[in-house]
Swiss-Prot record:
NCBIfam families, sorted: glut_race
Keywords from the UniProt entry: Cell shape, Cell wall biogenesis/degradation, Isomerase, Peptidoglycan synthesis
Protein name: Glutamate racemase
Pfam family name, one: Asp_Glu_race
Pathway: Cell wall biogenesis; peptidoglycan biosynthesis
InterPro entries from the UniProt entry: Asp/Glu/hydantoin_racemase, Asp/Glu_race, Asp/Glu_racemase_AS_1, Asp/Glu_racemase_AS_2, Glu_race
């Protein structure tokens, strides 16, 4: 494995971002690190979140010699990036909720942000709204349950549509025309979300924008010869997780995604 792109999340949500990056960089090597022992991140205290993420990512970067880190988690990106960038010497890319494109796309100027409770309450989120959606009415919806529902869907192939409809009922009645998916888990539920919310609501996420940023950064750090060498070989994919056990369904899904190696990383926070 040669200087992989390291994609990090609390669970499997970051795979939606990884998929977008692979569309642009199909021959690159990838590591996917998910801290599922501490899932969901939206319920952690800020300092616990920062210290745990920085220690875990630093450990895997040192081991894999990653070329770039993508924090594919909205909750972590709102608080972890400064400390992570101070620790690492390689580029770090975070996730920004797609508030700006949502405001530009909305015709009714009524938009929503669906995210974890942690992202919804961060000052950073309110700054984004003030800066890019000042001319819009913005509704905020926080849910950790949807994160767990996305994880369950991937692990078991099943989703409780009746419960999903209940969770989304405040959004249905909010009369929005654009909804920002402010958690990387939520694109995993895109079809079901669209089914409940109807075709009148456009769903936006940040995956494509992140992929373009990663491609740009790699082009700045690699020579033309290295880029050509990458294009002429098969991609190698490795996954790391922190929980003591993962389900057979999740293992099967990761293998189907192309991961050849799955390994548990032991940390002080991963004894669950």
């Amino acid at each position: 494995m040669s200087q992989p792109i390291l994609v990090f999340d609390s669970g499997i949500g970051g795979l939606s971002v990884l998929a977008e990056i692979r569309k642009l960089l199909p021959h690159h090597d990838y590591c996917y690190l998910f801290d599922n022992a501490r899932l969901p991140y939206g319920e952690l205290e800020e300092q616990e979140l920062v210290s745990g993420c920085v220690a875990l990512i630093d450990q895997v970067v040192e081991r894999t010699h990653a070329a770039i880190v993508v924090v594919a988690c909205n909750t972590a990106s709102t608080v972890v990036l400064p400390a992570l960038r101070a620790t690492l010497s390689i580029p770090v890319v975070g996730v920004v909720p797609a508030i700006k494109p949502a405001a530009q796309l909305s015709k009714s100027k009524r938009i929503g942000l669906l995210a974890t409770p942690g992202t919804v309450k961060r000052h950073y989120t309110y700054e984004l709204i003030s800066q890019f959606a000042d001319d819009c009415h913005v509704e905020l919806f926080g849910s950790s349950e949807l994160v767990l529902m996305a994880e369950q869907k991937i692990a078991t192939g099943q989703l409780d549509m009746a419960r999903l409809t209940q969770v989304l009922s405040p959004i249905v009645t909010a009369d929005l025309d654009v909804l920002v998916l402010g958690c990387t888990h939520f694109p995993m539920l895109r079809d079901e979300l669209q089914q409940v919310l109807g075709k009148g609501v456009t769903l936006l996420d940040s995956g494509e924008a992140i992929a373009k940023r990663v491609k740009t950064l790699l082009a700045e750090t690699k020579s033309e010869q290295q880029v050509q060498e990458d294009a002429n070989r098969d991609s190698v994919m490795q996954a790391f997780y922190t929980k003591a056990k993962i389900s057979e369904g999740l293992v099967s899904m990761l293998v189907d995604c192309g991961f050849s190696t799955l390994e548990r990383i032991t940390t002080i926070n991963s004894n669950r």
